[in-house]
């Protein structure tokens, strides 16, 4: 089955075109050009701001000229991740997709439905001449996944609409009306390398095949974090013997739970069998701990070539730090109606070793900004106690619920009419661009919804095909009835 045979055909045709365009975060130039050409080809007012956001304005259809101007918004970039054995250049190559039952998947890579499917819905509406709607502004932001660059750089007045539908949510049947704020904390350990003591034996330990996932939406699913697992083992062995660390590399993205990692270390030759036994026991325990969430994890331990190691004093501080830093959910929402929702969390996202530095990135999220500040300071303090140089991003704000939202009421009533059931109206423990929009456009009425996606930011990302039709029908009905 090809994408063009999927329903609604016009949406999947647009998605197929989008997936021909390389669009990693911070490298959206070709996508920006495509959107500009699309708008101009259709004769619509098309504008690009200095950040690279694109807006295409479509006039109202007959009889809807007096409706409020509705903004449809999605982000044009995608997270690029792949299986270890997949050969792809995300800056040049297309995403290859296939249908598996009711799911659309990619061949060993992220699918790019986050948020390519939102872009495809917007383009399909722009391309149509048979859909009723008021004045429309279709907005495509850049670099949402790494830095929210587009939303952060957008100036007040670029969007002129009264209401906004963000098409970057991942559970059909759920209408999101608030989101978490977030910050990123980075730490750097600087060191000199030295030769390992004579007679030391080098080992390489690895882990792969973890489930991973989105560091906001999936943080409460108790999935394994490759960095924390490898850190546990290093701390355990360092406590028993003179271990010398040479390399620690795991994770790529601040908003993804790390799925694999490799460490290289040296131990006295007479301890190498102890390490092997400990590793076997340790990995068996980890497999038991995560036997529900991470069923495909694989471990490796092998001898490797000698290399210069990190200075002992720095290595010790780093390993202790990585054992001490917490990961996962810190607090659930206190409101009884939202007790199921994560309030505050931290994701230890990446550790990268270079010749004379170890760089660590951790991302904090909270729906309560004071708790976000406290959590960020807690992570910062752990790094500082370990002697690391610490930097914190400016972060992005939470999007607060608007109890008087007209758009929410219209969206809920439309859903009930179309599908005969109540949608779930909720907040999300992830950053949405709506939080930044709410700062620059304080009177903007917003909701967020989208088709069902699973395992975004991983090569297991998949799109539930039937829900695309449901979201399409829902959005068109909202536009007709505003």
Provide a role label for each language-model segment.
Residues 7-11, 343-358, 363, 419-477:
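Zn-dependent metallopeptidase/amidohydrolase metal-coordination segment
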Residues 222-240, 269-272, 317-326, 332, ...:
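His/Asp/Glu-rich mid-to-C-terminal helical/loop segments that flank catalytic regions of hydrolases
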Residues 102-105, 145-146, 152-365:
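Midchain, well-structured core segments that form catalytic/ion-binding scaffolds
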Residues 218, 225-228, 232-248, 401-444:
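Active-site-adjacent substrate-binding region
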Residues 64-146, 151-162, 202, 315-318, ...:
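Active-site metal-coordination/substrate-binding segment of hydrolases
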Residues 341-426, 430:
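Substrate-recognition/cap regions that form aromatic- and gly/pro-loop-enriched pockets
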Residues 2-102:
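Acidic/His- and Gly-rich active-site-bordering loop/insert found
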């Amino acid at each position: 089955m090809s994408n063009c045979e999927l329903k609604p055909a016009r949406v999947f045709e647009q998605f197929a075109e989008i997936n021909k365009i390389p669009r990693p975060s911070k490298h959206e130039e070709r996508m920006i050009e495509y959107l500009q050409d699309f708008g101009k080809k259709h004769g619509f007012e098309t504008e690009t701001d200095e950040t690279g956001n694109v807006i295409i304005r479509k006039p109202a259809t007959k009889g809807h000229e007096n409706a409020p101007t509705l903004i449809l918004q999605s982000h044009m970039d995608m997270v690029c991740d792949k299986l270890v054995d997949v050969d792809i250049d995300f800056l040049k190559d297309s995403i290859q997709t296939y249908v598996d039952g009711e799911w659309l998947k990619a061949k060993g890579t992220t699918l790019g439905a986050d948020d390519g499917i939102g872009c495809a819905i917007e383009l399909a509406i722009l391309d149509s001449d048979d859909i009723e709607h008021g004045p429309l502004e279709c907005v495509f932001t850049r670099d949402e996944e790494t830095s929210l660059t587009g939303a952060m750089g957008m100036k007040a007045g670029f969007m002129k609409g009264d209401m906004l539908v963000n098409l970057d949510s991942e559970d059909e049947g759920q209408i999101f009306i608030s989101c978490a704020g977030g910050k990123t904390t980075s730490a750097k350990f600087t060191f000199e390398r030295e030769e390992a003591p004579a007679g030391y034996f080098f080992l390489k330990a690895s882990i792969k095949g973890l489930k991973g996932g989105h560091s906001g939406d999936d943080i409460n699913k108790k999935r394994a974090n490759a960095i924390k697992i490898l850190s546990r083992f290093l701390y355990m062995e360092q406590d028993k013997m003179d271990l010398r660390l040479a390399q620690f590399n795991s994770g790529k993205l601040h908003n993804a739970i790390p799925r694999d990692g490799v460490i290289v270390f040296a131990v006295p030759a007479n301890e190498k069998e102890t390490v092997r036994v400990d590793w076997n026991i340790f990995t068996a325990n980890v497999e038991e701990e995560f036997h529900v969430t991470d069923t495909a994890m694989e471990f490796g331990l092998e001898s490797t070539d000698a290399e210069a190691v990190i200075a002992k004093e720095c290595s010790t501080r780093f390993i202790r730090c990585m054992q001490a830093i917490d990961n996962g959910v810190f607090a659930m929402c206190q409101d009884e109606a939202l007790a199921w929702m994560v309030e505050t969390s931290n994701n230890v996202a990446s550790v990268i070793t270079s010749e004379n530095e170890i760089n660590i990135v951790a991302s904090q999220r909270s729906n309560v900004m004071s708790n976000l500040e406290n959590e960020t300071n807690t992570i910062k303090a752990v790094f500082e106690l370990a002697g690391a140089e610490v930097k914190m991003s400016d972060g992005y704000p939470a999007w607060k619920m608007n109890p008087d939202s007209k758009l929410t009421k219209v969206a809920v009533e439309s859903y009930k009419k179309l599908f005969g059931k109540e949608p779930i109206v909720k907040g999300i423990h992830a950053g949405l661009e709506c939080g930044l929009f709410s700062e620059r456009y304080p009177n903007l009425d917003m909701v967020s919804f989208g088709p069902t996606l699973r395992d975004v930011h991983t090569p297991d990302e998949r799109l539930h095909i039937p829900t695309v039709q449901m979201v399409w029908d829902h959005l068109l009905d909202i536009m007709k009835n505003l």
